[in-house]
Amino acid sequence: MDPNSILLSPQPQICSHLAEACTEGERSSSPPELDRDSPFPWSQVPSSSPTDPEWFGDEHIQAKRARVETIVRGMCLSPNPLVPGNAQAGVSPRCPKKARERKRKQNLPTPQGLLMPAPAWDQGNRKGGPRVREQLHLLKQQLRHLQEHILQAAKPRDTAQGPGGCGTGKGPLSAKQGNGCGPRPWVVDGDHQQGTSKDLSGAEKHQESEKPSFLPSGAPASLEILRKELTRAVSQAVDSVLQKVLLDPPGHLTQLGRSFQGQVAEGRSEPSPPVGGACKDPLALAALPRRVQLQAGVPVGNLSLAKRLDSPRYPIPPRMTPKPCQDPPANFPLTAPSHIQENQILSQLLGHRYNNGHWSSSPPQDSSSQRHPSSEPALRPWRTTKPQPLVLSQQQCPLPFTSAHLESLPLLPSVKMEQRGLHAVMEALPFSLLHIQEGLNPGHLKKAKLMFFFTRYPSSNLLKVYFPDVQFNRCITSQMIKWFSNFREFYYIQMEKSARQAISDGVTNPKMLVVLRNSELFQALNMHYNKGNDFEVPDCFLEIASLTLQEFFRAVSAGRDSDPSWKKPIYKIISKLDSDIPEIFKSSSYPQ
Protein backbone atom coordinates (compact mmCIF):
# COMPACT_ATOMS: atom_id res chain seq x y z
CA MET A 1 0.00 0.00 0.00
CA ASP A 2 1.26 3.44 -0.91
CA PRO A 3 2.20 5.51 2.15
CA ASN A 4 0.90 8.66 0.46
CA SER A 5 -2.59 7.21 0.39
CA ILE A 6 -2.38 6.38 4.09
CA LEU A 7 -1.33 9.92 5.03
CA LEU A 8 -3.86 11.58 2.77
CA SER A 9 -6.82 9.48 3.86
CA PRO A 10 -8.31 11.97 6.40
CA GLN A 11 -8.79 14.68 3.83
CA PRO A 12 -8.07 13.07 0.49
CA GLN A 13 -8.96 15.84 -1.92
CA ILE A 14 -7.96 19.13 -0.28
CA CYS A 15 -4.78 17.80 1.28
CA SER A 16 -3.69 16.10 -1.94
CA HIS A 17 -4.01 19.35 -3.87
CA LEU A 18 -2.17 21.28 -1.21
CA ALA A 19 0.51 18.60 -0.98
CA GLU A 20 1.09 18.70 -4.69
CA ALA A 21 1.27 22.47 -4.64
CA CYS A 22 3.75 22.50 -1.80
CA THR A 23 5.78 19.71 -3.43
CA GLU A 24 6.16 21.79 -6.57
CA GLY A 25 6.96 24.98 -4.62
CA GLU A 26 9.40 23.68 -2.02
CA ARG A 27 11.99 21.12 -2.91
CA SER A 28 14.66 22.35 -0.54
CA SER A 29 12.99 22.19 2.88
CA SER A 30 14.96 20.22 5.45
CA PRO A 31 13.26 17.22 7.05
CA PRO A 32 15.11 17.46 10.34
CA GLU A 33 13.61 20.90 10.99
CA LEU A 34 10.14 19.61 10.40
CA ASP A 35 10.73 16.56 12.50
CA ARG A 36 11.17 18.65 15.63
CA ASP A 37 7.70 20.13 15.37
CA SER A 38 5.98 17.08 14.02
CA PRO A 39 3.65 15.24 16.34
CA PHE A 40 3.83 12.13 14.23
CA PRO A 41 6.27 9.36 15.22
CA TRP A 42 8.66 9.86 12.37
CA SER A 43 11.39 8.10 14.36
CA GLN A 44 9.64 4.81 13.92
CA VAL A 45 10.05 4.99 10.16
CA PRO A 46 13.26 3.26 9.11
CA SER A 47 15.83 5.67 7.68
CA SER A 48 18.27 4.99 4.88
CA SER A 49 21.82 6.10 4.47
CA PRO A 50 23.05 8.15 1.49
CA THR A 51 24.85 5.13 0.19
CA ASP A 52 21.58 3.19 0.00
CA PRO A 53 20.22 3.11 -3.55
CA GLU A 54 16.69 3.84 -2.19
CA TRP A 55 17.87 6.83 -0.12
CA PHE A 56 16.74 9.41 -2.66
CA GLY A 57 13.29 7.88 -2.77
CA ASP A 58 12.99 7.76 1.04
CA GLU A 59 14.16 11.35 1.35
CA HIS A 60 11.53 12.44 -1.15
CA ILE A 61 8.84 10.58 0.75
CA GLN A 62 9.89 12.05 4.10
CA ALA A 63 9.89 15.59 2.69
CA LYS A 64 6.43 15.05 1.28
CA ARG A 65 5.23 13.69 4.62
CA ALA A 66 6.64 16.69 6.47
CA ARG A 67 4.99 19.15 4.14
CA VAL A 68 1.64 17.37 4.30
CA GLU A 69 1.87 17.27 8.09
CA THR A 70 2.58 21.00 8.18
CA ILE A 71 -0.40 21.73 5.95
CA VAL A 72 -2.73 19.51 7.98
CA ARG A 73 -1.53 21.06 11.24
CA GLY A 74 -2.06 24.53 9.83
CA MET A 75 -5.56 23.59 8.76
CA CYS A 76 -6.36 22.30 12.23
CA LEU A 77 -5.01 25.42 13.93
CA SER A 78 -6.65 27.92 11.56
CA PRO A 79 -10.06 29.32 12.71
CA ASN A 80 -11.74 28.63 9.35
CA PRO A 81 -11.32 25.63 7.07
CA LEU A 82 -9.87 26.36 3.71
CA VAL A 83 -12.38 26.78 0.95
CA PRO A 84 -11.76 26.83 -2.80
CA GLY A 85 -12.21 30.61 -2.83
CA ASN A 86 -9.17 31.26 -0.64
CA ALA A 87 -7.17 28.16 -1.45
CA GLN A 88 -4.77 30.30 -3.44
CA ALA A 89 -3.85 32.18 -0.29
CA GLY A 90 -2.35 29.05 1.20
CA VAL A 91 -0.60 27.93 -1.98
CA SER A 92 2.70 29.75 -1.86
CA PRO A 93 6.39 28.88 -1.61
CA ARG A 94 6.30 29.94 2.07
CA CYS A 95 3.34 27.81 3.11
CA PRO A 96 4.97 26.03 6.12
CA LYS A 97 6.43 29.21 7.51
CA LYS A 98 3.07 31.01 7.38
CA ALA A 99 1.45 28.05 9.07
CA ARG A 100 3.89 28.30 11.96
CA GLU A 101 3.28 32.07 12.20
CA ARG A 102 -0.47 31.46 12.39
CA LYS A 103 0.14 28.91 15.12
CA ARG A 104 2.07 31.42 17.22
CA LYS A 105 -0.64 34.08 16.70
CA GLN A 106 -3.34 31.69 17.86
CA ASN A 107 -1.50 31.10 21.14
CA LEU A 108 -1.53 34.82 21.99
CA PRO A 109 -4.45 35.93 24.26
CA THR A 110 -6.89 38.18 22.39
CA PRO A 111 -9.88 40.05 23.87
CA GLN A 112 -13.20 38.45 22.98
CA GLY A 113 -15.40 41.57 23.20
CA LEU A 114 -13.46 43.93 20.95
CA LEU A 115 -12.14 42.48 17.69
CA MET A 116 -9.54 44.62 15.96
CA PRO A 117 -9.82 44.95 12.21
CA ALA A 118 -7.67 42.24 10.67
CA PRO A 119 -5.83 42.31 7.36
CA ALA A 120 -7.63 41.47 4.20
CA TRP A 121 -6.19 37.97 3.96
CA ASP A 122 -7.21 37.19 7.56
CA GLN A 123 -10.76 38.46 7.01
CA GLY A 124 -11.17 36.05 4.16
CA ASN A 125 -10.27 33.17 6.47
CA ARG A 126 -12.46 34.37 9.37
CA LYS A 127 -15.72 35.03 7.50
CA GLY A 128 -16.47 31.46 6.81
CA GLY A 129 -15.43 30.10 10.20
CA PRO A 130 -17.68 27.73 12.14
CA ARG A 131 -18.09 30.14 15.06
CA VAL A 132 -19.22 32.99 12.84
CA ARG A 133 -21.56 30.73 10.95
CA GLU A 134 -23.04 29.40 14.17
CA GLN A 135 -23.63 32.90 15.48
CA LEU A 136 -25.17 33.97 12.19
CA HIS A 137 -27.42 30.95 12.29
CA LEU A 138 -28.58 31.78 15.82
CA LEU A 139 -29.16 35.40 14.81
CA LYS A 140 -31.25 34.35 11.83
CA GLN A 141 -33.32 32.07 14.05
CA GLN A 142 -33.96 34.88 16.52
CA LEU A 143 -34.98 37.23 13.74
CA ARG A 144 -37.22 34.56 12.24
CA HIS A 145 -38.99 34.09 15.60
CA LEU A 146 -39.38 37.84 15.95
CA GLN A 147 -40.84 38.06 12.47
CA GLU A 148 -43.34 35.29 13.24
CA HIS A 149 -44.48 37.10 16.41
CA ILE A 150 -44.96 40.32 14.47
CA LEU A 151 -46.90 38.52 11.75
CA GLN A 152 -49.15 36.85 14.34
CA ALA A 153 -49.82 40.22 15.97
CA ALA A 154 -50.54 41.85 12.62
CA LYS A 155 -52.95 39.18 11.33
CA PRO A 156 -55.82 40.00 13.78
CA ARG A 157 -55.53 43.68 12.90
CA ASP A 158 -55.73 42.95 9.20
CA THR A 159 -58.85 40.81 9.67
CA ALA A 160 -60.46 43.44 11.95
CA GLN A 161 -60.05 46.13 9.32
CA GLY A 162 -62.62 44.47 7.07
CA PRO A 163 -62.66 42.38 3.91
CA GLY A 164 -61.86 45.42 1.80
CA GLY A 165 -58.26 45.28 2.87
CA CYS A 166 -58.09 48.83 4.13
CA GLY A 167 -55.20 48.11 6.46
CA THR A 168 -53.18 45.96 4.04
CA GLY A 169 -49.72 47.32 3.64
CA LYS A 170 -50.16 49.96 6.35
CA GLY A 171 -49.32 47.96 9.43
CA PRO A 172 -45.93 46.92 10.68
CA LEU A 173 -45.65 44.40 7.84
CA SER A 174 -46.77 44.81 4.28
CA ALA A 175 -48.36 42.08 2.22
CA LYS A 176 -45.12 41.24 0.49
CA GLN A 177 -43.25 41.03 3.74
CA GLY A 178 -45.96 38.88 5.28
CA ASN A 179 -45.76 36.36 2.43
CA GLY A 180 -42.01 36.38 2.32
CA CYS A 181 -41.86 37.69 -1.24
CA GLY A 182 -40.73 41.24 -0.61
CA PRO A 183 -37.62 42.68 1.00
CA ARG A 184 -37.48 42.39 4.77
CA PRO A 185 -35.45 45.01 6.57
CA TRP A 186 -34.78 42.75 9.55
CA VAL A 187 -33.65 39.61 7.64
CA VAL A 188 -29.88 39.38 7.31
CA ASP A 189 -28.72 38.82 3.75
CA GLY A 190 -26.02 36.18 3.39
CA ASP A 191 -24.11 37.93 0.62
CA HIS A 192 -24.21 41.24 2.45
CA GLN A 193 -23.02 39.59 5.66
CA GLN A 194 -20.10 37.89 3.91
CA GLY A 195 -19.04 41.05 2.13
CA THR A 196 -19.15 43.40 5.11
CA SER A 197 -16.05 44.40 7.03
CA LYS A 198 -17.72 44.93 10.43
CA ASP A 199 -17.18 42.58 13.36
CA LEU A 200 -19.88 40.35 14.79
CA SER A 201 -20.58 42.41 17.90
CA GLY A 202 -21.19 45.53 15.84
CA ALA A 203 -23.58 43.63 13.60
CA GLU A 204 -25.53 42.29 16.58
CA LYS A 205 -25.81 45.75 18.14
CA HIS A 206 -27.01 47.15 14.83
CA GLN A 207 -29.66 44.46 14.52
CA GLU A 208 -30.85 45.00 18.10
CA SER A 209 -31.06 48.74 17.55
CA GLU A 210 -33.17 48.24 14.45
CA LYS A 211 -35.80 46.10 16.16
CA PRO A 212 -37.22 48.61 18.67
CA SER A 213 -36.90 51.53 16.27
CA PHE A 214 -39.06 49.84 13.65
CA LEU A 215 -41.93 48.67 15.83
CA PRO A 216 -42.96 52.00 17.45
CA SER A 217 -43.08 53.73 14.08
CA GLY A 218 -45.56 51.20 12.66
CA ALA A 219 -47.67 50.53 15.77
CA PRO A 220 -49.22 54.04 16.11
CA ALA A 221 -50.09 54.05 12.42
CA SER A 222 -51.89 50.72 12.65
CA LEU A 223 -53.67 51.78 15.84
CA GLU A 224 -54.82 55.02 14.20
CA ILE A 225 -56.12 53.16 11.15
CA LEU A 226 -57.93 50.63 13.34
CA ARG A 227 -59.46 53.40 15.44
CA LYS A 228 -60.78 55.22 12.36
CA GLU A 229 -62.23 52.06 10.87
CA LEU A 230 -63.97 51.12 14.11
CA THR A 231 -65.40 54.63 14.46
CA ARG A 232 -66.76 54.57 10.93
CA ALA A 233 -68.23 51.10 11.35
CA VAL A 234 -69.93 51.98 14.64
CA SER A 235 -71.34 55.19 13.17
CA GLN A 236 -72.77 53.38 10.18
CA ALA A 237 -74.29 50.68 12.39
CA VAL A 238 -75.93 53.22 14.69
CA ASP A 239 -77.31 55.18 11.74
CA SER A 240 -78.75 52.07 10.12
CA VAL A 241 -80.45 50.96 13.35
CA LEU A 242 -81.96 54.39 13.96
CA GLN A 243 -83.23 54.58 10.41
CA LYS A 244 -84.86 51.14 10.61
CA VAL A 245 -86.51 51.84 13.96
CA LEU A 246 -87.62 55.42 13.50
CA LEU A 247 -88.42 55.60 9.79
CA ASP A 248 -90.96 53.57 7.84
CA PRO A 249 -91.18 54.94 4.26
CA PRO A 250 -88.30 53.71 2.06
CA GLY A 251 -88.07 57.02 0.19
CA HIS A 252 -87.27 59.10 3.25
CA LEU A 253 -85.07 56.32 4.57
CA THR A 254 -82.91 56.54 1.46
CA GLN A 255 -82.78 60.31 1.62
CA LEU A 256 -81.85 60.54 5.28
CA GLY A 257 -79.41 57.66 4.98
CA ARG A 258 -77.41 59.54 2.38
CA SER A 259 -77.37 62.71 4.43
CA PHE A 260 -76.33 60.77 7.54
CA GLN A 261 -73.47 59.00 5.77
CA GLY A 262 -72.18 62.23 4.28
CA GLN A 263 -72.18 64.06 7.58
CA VAL A 264 -70.97 61.27 9.83
CA ALA A 265 -67.94 60.76 7.56
CA GLU A 266 -66.82 64.31 8.30
CA GLY A 267 -66.93 63.60 12.05
CA ARG A 268 -68.37 67.05 12.87
CA SER A 269 -72.08 66.33 12.99
CA GLU A 270 -74.43 64.20 14.99
CA PRO A 271 -77.45 62.38 13.54
CA SER A 272 -80.85 63.23 14.90
CA PRO A 273 -83.50 61.43 12.85
CA PRO A 274 -87.01 62.84 12.83
CA VAL A 275 -89.48 61.37 15.22
CA GLY A 276 -92.66 63.01 13.99
CA GLY A 277 -95.23 60.34 13.24
CA ALA A 278 -92.96 57.46 12.38
CA CYS A 279 -91.81 56.57 15.86
CA LYS A 280 -93.90 53.81 17.35
CA ASP A 281 -91.73 52.80 20.29
CA PRO A 282 -91.86 55.12 23.33
CA LEU A 283 -88.65 53.59 24.66
CA ALA A 284 -86.79 54.75 21.59
CA LEU A 285 -87.96 58.29 22.26
CA ALA A 286 -86.76 58.12 25.85
CA ALA A 287 -83.33 57.03 24.65
CA LEU A 288 -82.97 59.97 22.29
CA PRO A 289 -80.98 63.00 23.41
CA ARG A 290 -82.72 66.02 24.82
CA ARG A 291 -82.00 68.25 21.87
CA VAL A 292 -83.68 65.76 19.53
CA GLN A 293 -86.81 65.79 21.67
CA LEU A 294 -86.81 69.57 21.83
CA GLN A 295 -86.59 69.77 18.08
CA ALA A 296 -89.23 67.15 17.49
CA GLY A 297 -91.65 67.87 20.31
CA VAL A 298 -92.16 71.63 20.09
CA PRO A 299 -95.95 72.11 20.03
CA VAL A 300 -97.25 74.42 17.34
CA GLY A 301 -100.35 76.24 18.50
CA ASN A 302 -103.38 73.98 18.70
CA LEU A 303 -102.69 71.99 15.56
CA SER A 304 -103.59 68.33 15.89
CA LEU A 305 -100.64 67.22 13.77
CA ALA A 306 -98.14 68.70 16.18
CA LYS A 307 -97.84 65.82 18.60
CA ARG A 308 -96.24 66.49 21.93
CA LEU A 309 -93.55 64.35 23.42
CA ASP A 310 -94.67 64.08 27.04
CA SER A 311 -91.39 63.35 28.74
CA PRO A 312 -91.12 64.33 32.44
CA ARG A 313 -87.35 64.21 32.27
CA TYR A 314 -87.03 66.84 29.58
CA PRO A 315 -89.70 69.51 30.09
CA ILE A 316 -90.01 72.07 27.36
CA PRO A 317 -89.28 75.58 28.63
CA PRO A 318 -92.17 78.04 28.39
CA ARG A 319 -90.18 80.32 26.15
CA MET A 320 -89.78 77.46 23.72
CA THR A 321 -93.58 77.20 23.38
CA PRO A 322 -94.52 79.34 20.38
CA LYS A 323 -97.90 80.63 19.40
CA PRO A 324 -99.19 81.00 15.87
CA CYS A 325 -99.03 84.43 14.28
CA GLN A 326 -102.78 84.57 13.82
CA ASP A 327 -105.56 82.12 14.45
CA PRO A 328 -106.92 80.44 11.34
CA PRO A 329 -110.48 81.28 10.32
CA ALA A 330 -113.33 79.31 11.79
CA ASN A 331 -114.12 77.51 8.55
CA PHE A 332 -110.64 76.03 8.34
CA PRO A 333 -110.49 72.52 9.80
CA LEU A 334 -107.49 71.77 11.98
CA THR A 335 -107.14 68.15 10.90
CA ALA A 336 -105.66 66.73 7.75
CA PRO A 337 -106.91 63.76 5.68
CA SER A 338 -105.34 60.38 6.28
CA HIS A 339 -103.58 60.28 2.91
CA ILE A 340 -101.81 63.51 3.78
CA GLN A 341 -100.78 62.18 7.17
CA GLU A 342 -99.22 59.12 5.58
CA ASN A 343 -96.88 61.28 3.53
CA GLN A 344 -95.91 63.56 6.43
CA ILE A 345 -92.98 61.76 8.00
CA LEU A 346 -91.01 64.91 8.74
CA SER A 347 -94.00 66.94 9.91
CA GLN A 348 -92.55 67.93 13.27
CA LEU A 349 -89.19 69.04 11.98
CA LEU A 350 -89.81 70.40 8.52
CA GLY A 351 -92.50 72.97 9.29
CA HIS A 352 -96.06 73.52 8.15
CA ARG A 353 -97.67 74.67 4.96
CA TYR A 354 -101.14 75.58 3.82
CA ASN A 355 -102.22 73.00 1.28
CA ASN A 356 -105.66 72.27 -0.22
CA GLY A 357 -107.47 74.38 2.37
CA HIS A 358 -105.92 72.57 5.33
CA TRP A 359 -103.15 73.36 7.76
CA SER A 360 -100.82 70.41 7.29
CA SER A 361 -97.38 69.47 8.47
CA SER A 362 -95.99 68.23 5.18
CA PRO A 363 -92.64 69.67 4.10
CA PRO A 364 -92.55 71.95 1.05
CA GLN A 365 -92.24 69.64 -1.92
CA ASP A 366 -93.05 69.90 -5.55
CA SER A 367 -95.95 68.07 -7.14
CA SER A 368 -93.80 65.28 -8.49
CA SER A 369 -92.44 64.43 -5.05
CA GLN A 370 -95.97 64.34 -3.61
CA ARG A 371 -97.19 62.00 -6.31
CA HIS A 372 -94.23 59.70 -5.73
CA PRO A 373 -93.59 59.43 -2.01
CA SER A 374 -90.60 57.13 -2.53
CA SER A 375 -88.71 59.68 -4.61
CA GLU A 376 -86.34 62.02 -2.81
CA PRO A 377 -87.75 65.50 -2.31
CA ALA A 378 -85.69 68.39 -3.54
CA LEU A 379 -84.53 69.70 -0.18
CA ARG A 380 -82.53 72.87 -0.31
CA PRO A 381 -79.52 73.14 1.99
CA TRP A 382 -80.43 75.03 5.13
CA ARG A 383 -77.22 77.04 5.25
CA THR A 384 -77.89 78.79 1.95
CA THR A 385 -80.49 81.16 3.40
CA LYS A 386 -80.87 82.53 6.90
CA PRO A 387 -84.24 83.54 8.33
CA GLN A 388 -84.16 87.26 9.03
CA PRO A 389 -85.67 88.52 12.28
CA LEU A 390 -89.15 89.87 11.76
CA VAL A 391 -88.43 93.37 12.98
CA LEU A 392 -91.26 95.51 11.67
CA SER A 393 -90.78 99.24 12.03
CA GLN A 394 -94.35 100.46 11.52
CA GLN A 395 -96.52 97.36 11.89
CA GLN A 396 -97.93 95.98 15.10
CA CYS A 397 -97.96 92.33 14.04
CA PRO A 398 -95.85 90.15 11.74
CA LEU A 399 -97.22 89.53 8.29
CA PRO A 400 -99.25 86.33 7.82
CA PHE A 401 -97.38 83.54 6.11
CA THR A 402 -98.46 82.45 2.67
CA SER A 403 -97.68 79.34 0.69
CA ALA A 404 -95.16 81.18 -1.47
CA HIS A 405 -93.44 82.51 1.63
CA LEU A 406 -93.20 79.05 3.10
CA GLU A 407 -91.57 77.74 -0.05
CA SER A 408 -88.78 80.28 0.34
CA LEU A 409 -88.05 79.37 3.97
CA PRO A 410 -85.19 76.98 4.74
CA LEU A 411 -85.96 73.61 6.17
CA LEU A 412 -84.75 72.24 9.44
CA PRO A 413 -81.68 70.05 8.88
CA SER A 414 -81.64 66.40 9.81
CA VAL A 415 -78.70 66.98 12.11
CA LYS A 416 -77.89 69.72 14.54
CA MET A 417 -74.44 71.14 14.17
CA GLU A 418 -72.57 71.13 17.43
CA GLN A 419 -70.89 74.11 19.10
CA ARG A 420 -73.60 76.44 17.87
CA GLY A 421 -75.88 76.18 20.89
CA LEU A 422 -79.41 77.52 21.14
CA HIS A 423 -78.71 80.35 18.73
CA ALA A 424 -78.17 77.98 15.80
CA VAL A 425 -81.35 76.05 16.63
CA MET A 426 -83.43 79.20 16.73
CA GLU A 427 -82.10 80.30 13.36
CA ALA A 428 -82.97 76.97 11.76
CA LEU A 429 -86.47 76.48 13.18
CA PRO A 430 -89.20 76.52 10.53
CA PHE A 431 -92.61 78.19 10.26
CA SER A 432 -93.83 77.66 13.79
CA LEU A 433 -90.81 79.20 15.49
CA LEU A 434 -89.72 81.79 12.97
CA HIS A 435 -91.36 84.43 15.17
CA ILE A 436 -88.53 84.07 17.65
CA GLN A 437 -86.81 87.40 17.27
CA GLU A 438 -83.21 88.40 17.59
CA GLY A 439 -84.46 91.90 18.50
CA LEU A 440 -87.53 93.73 19.73
CA ASN A 441 -90.18 95.39 17.58
CA PRO A 442 -92.97 97.94 18.23
CA GLY A 443 -95.42 95.10 18.94
CA HIS A 444 -93.32 94.08 21.91
CA LEU A 445 -93.24 97.67 23.15
CA LYS A 446 -97.03 97.92 22.95
CA LYS A 447 -97.47 94.69 24.90
CA ALA A 448 -95.03 95.90 27.57
CA LYS A 449 -96.99 99.14 27.98
CA LEU A 450 -100.24 97.25 28.40
CA MET A 451 -98.61 94.91 30.89
CA PHE A 452 -97.70 97.96 32.99
CA PHE A 453 -101.36 98.26 33.96
CA PHE A 454 -100.92 94.95 35.85
CA THR A 455 -97.27 94.89 36.94
CA ARG A 456 -94.83 97.72 37.55
CA TYR A 457 -91.78 95.68 38.60
CA PRO A 458 -91.66 92.55 36.41
CA SER A 459 -88.84 90.04 36.77
CA SER A 460 -86.82 88.62 33.91
CA ASN A 461 -88.49 85.22 34.28
CA LEU A 462 -91.91 86.83 34.02
CA LEU A 463 -90.86 88.62 30.85
CA LYS A 464 -89.67 85.37 29.29
CA VAL A 465 -93.02 83.75 30.01
CA TYR A 466 -95.07 86.53 28.44
CA PHE A 467 -92.74 87.10 25.49
CA PRO A 468 -92.29 83.58 24.07
CA ASP A 469 -91.43 84.86 20.61
CA VAL A 470 -88.33 86.72 21.78
CA GLN A 471 -84.92 85.12 21.88
CA PHE A 472 -83.76 86.44 25.22
CA ASN A 473 -80.19 87.35 25.90
CA ARG A 474 -78.52 89.80 28.23
CA CYS A 475 -79.05 92.76 25.93
CA ILE A 476 -82.74 92.10 25.24
CA THR A 477 -83.49 91.43 28.90
CA SER A 478 -81.84 94.67 29.97
CA GLN A 479 -83.70 96.53 27.23
CA MET A 480 -87.09 95.30 28.48
CA ILE A 481 -86.21 96.12 32.06
CA LYS A 482 -85.24 99.58 30.87
CA TRP A 483 -88.65 99.94 29.21
CA PHE A 484 -90.46 99.30 32.49
CA SER A 485 -88.09 101.65 34.27
CA ASN A 486 -89.11 104.41 31.87
CA PHE A 487 -92.78 103.50 32.36
CA ARG A 488 -92.39 103.88 36.13
CA GLU A 489 -90.53 107.14 35.79
CA PHE A 490 -93.34 108.70 33.73
CA TYR A 491 -95.89 107.26 36.16
CA TYR A 492 -94.22 108.71 39.27
CA ILE A 493 -93.66 112.08 37.61
CA GLN A 494 -97.37 112.34 36.86
CA MET A 495 -98.26 111.29 40.41
CA GLU A 496 -95.93 113.84 42.01
CA LYS A 497 -97.20 116.54 39.70
CA SER A 498 -100.85 115.78 40.58
CA ALA A 499 -100.04 115.63 44.33
CA ARG A 500 -98.38 119.05 44.32
CA GLN A 501 -101.28 120.40 42.27
CA ALA A 502 -103.72 119.12 44.90
CA ILE A 503 -101.70 120.73 47.70
CA SER A 504 -101.68 124.03 45.84
CA ASP A 505 -105.45 123.69 45.40
CA GLY A 506 -105.87 123.48 49.19
CA VAL A 507 -106.66 119.81 49.57
CA THR A 508 -105.88 118.64 53.09
CA ASN A 509 -107.33 115.15 53.26
CA PRO A 510 -105.51 112.55 51.11
CA LYS A 511 -108.60 110.32 51.10
CA MET A 512 -110.25 112.81 48.79
CA LEU A 513 -107.67 112.08 46.07
CA VAL A 514 -109.17 109.37 43.86
CA VAL A 515 -108.21 108.66 40.22
CA LEU A 516 -111.29 108.34 38.01
CA ARG A 517 -111.55 107.46 34.34
CA ASN A 518 -112.61 110.98 33.43
CA SER A 519 -109.85 112.64 35.44
CA GLU A 520 -106.99 114.54 33.85
CA LEU A 521 -104.39 112.24 35.42
CA PHE A 522 -106.03 109.14 33.99
CA GLN A 523 -106.22 110.69 30.53
CA ALA A 524 -102.48 111.40 30.59
CA LEU A 525 -101.62 107.87 31.69
CA ASN A 526 -104.00 106.26 29.22
CA MET A 527 -102.58 108.31 26.37
CA HIS A 528 -99.06 107.16 27.23
CA TYR A 529 -99.65 103.43 27.87
CA ASN A 530 -102.74 102.83 25.74
CA LYS A 531 -102.18 105.15 22.84
CA GLY A 532 -104.70 103.55 20.50
CA ASN A 533 -107.27 103.39 23.32
CA ASP A 534 -108.08 99.84 22.15
CA PHE A 535 -107.48 98.27 25.52
CA GLU A 536 -109.77 98.60 28.51
CA VAL A 537 -107.76 99.70 31.53
CA PRO A 538 -108.50 97.39 34.48
CA ASP A 539 -110.01 98.75 37.68
CA CYS A 540 -107.09 97.48 39.70
CA PHE A 541 -104.85 100.01 38.00
CA LEU A 542 -107.18 102.84 39.04
CA GLU A 543 -106.93 101.67 42.65
CA ILE A 544 -103.11 101.51 42.49
CA ALA A 545 -102.97 104.95 40.89
CA SER A 546 -105.19 106.43 43.64
CA LEU A 547 -103.00 104.88 46.36
CA THR A 548 -99.83 106.18 44.72
CA LEU A 549 -101.26 109.69 44.48
CA GLN A 550 -102.18 109.68 48.16
CA GLU A 551 -98.68 108.53 49.19
CA PHE A 552 -97.06 111.32 47.21
CA PHE A 553 -99.50 113.79 48.74
CA ARG A 554 -98.56 112.71 52.28
CA ALA A 555 -94.82 112.83 51.57
CA VAL A 556 -94.92 116.30 50.01
CA SER A 557 -97.27 117.62 52.71
CA ALA A 558 -94.90 116.34 55.44
CA GLY A 559 -91.91 117.94 53.77
CA ARG A 560 -90.11 114.68 53.19
CA ASP A 561 -89.35 115.72 49.63
CA SER A 562 -86.24 117.54 50.87
CA ASP A 563 -84.58 114.14 51.40
CA PRO A 564 -82.91 112.85 48.22
CA SER A 565 -84.32 109.35 48.82
CA TRP A 566 -87.81 110.39 49.87
CA LYS A 567 -89.43 108.38 47.04
CA LYS A 568 -87.98 105.01 48.05
CA PRO A 569 -90.69 104.19 50.64
CA ILE A 570 -93.31 104.86 47.99
CA TYR A 571 -91.51 102.55 45.56
CA LYS A 572 -91.56 99.72 48.11
CA ILE A 573 -95.29 100.09 48.63
CA ILE A 574 -96.10 100.12 44.92
CA SER A 575 -93.79 97.18 44.14
CA LYS A 576 -95.91 94.94 46.38
CA LEU A 577 -99.13 95.75 44.61
CA ASP A 578 -98.59 93.96 41.31
CA SER A 579 -101.55 91.92 40.13
CA ASP A 580 -101.85 88.87 37.92
CA ILE A 581 -101.46 89.29 34.16
CA PRO A 582 -104.15 87.74 31.95
CA GLU A 583 -103.25 84.56 30.09
CA ILE A 584 -103.92 86.19 26.75
CA PHE A 585 -100.67 88.11 27.10
CA LYS A 586 -98.74 84.85 26.79
CA SER A 587 -99.72 84.61 23.16
CA SER A 588 -97.07 85.79 20.73
CA SER A 589 -99.77 87.24 18.49
CA TYR A 590 -101.24 89.48 21.19
CA PRO A 591 -101.87 92.33 20.75
CA GLN A 592 -102.55 92.33 17.04
UniProtKB/Swiss-Prot annotation:
Ranges of compositional bias, category Low complexity: 360-377
Region of interest (Homeo-Prospero), ranges: 437-592
Disulphide bond pairs: none
Disordered as annotated region, ranges: 20-56, 85-129, 155-218, 308-336, 353-382
A GO MF term: DNA-binding transcription factor activity, RNA polymerase II-specific
Domain Prospero-type homeo: 437-495
The keyword DNA-binding is assigned to this record: yes
GO biological process, one term: regulation of transcription by RNA polymerase II
Keyword line: DNA-binding, Homeobox, Nucleus, Transcription, Transcription regulation
Entry's localization field: Nucleus
Bias (Basic residues): 95-106
Ranges of residues in domain Prospero: 496-592
Gene3D superfamilies per record: Homeo-prospero domain
Compositionally biased region (Pro residues): 314-331
Annotated Basic and acidic residues bias: 201-211
Phenotype upon changing R474H: Found in a patient with intellectual disability, seizures, mild hypotonia and no speech
Keyword Transcription tagged: yes
Function, in words: Transcription regulator. Does not seem to be essential for embryonic development and postnatal survival.
Family under the similarity heading: Belongs to the Prospero homeodomain family.
Protein name: Prospero homeobox protein 2
Organism name: Homo sapiens
Lineage: Eukaryota, Metazoa, Chordata, Craniata, Vertebrata
Originating gene: PROX2
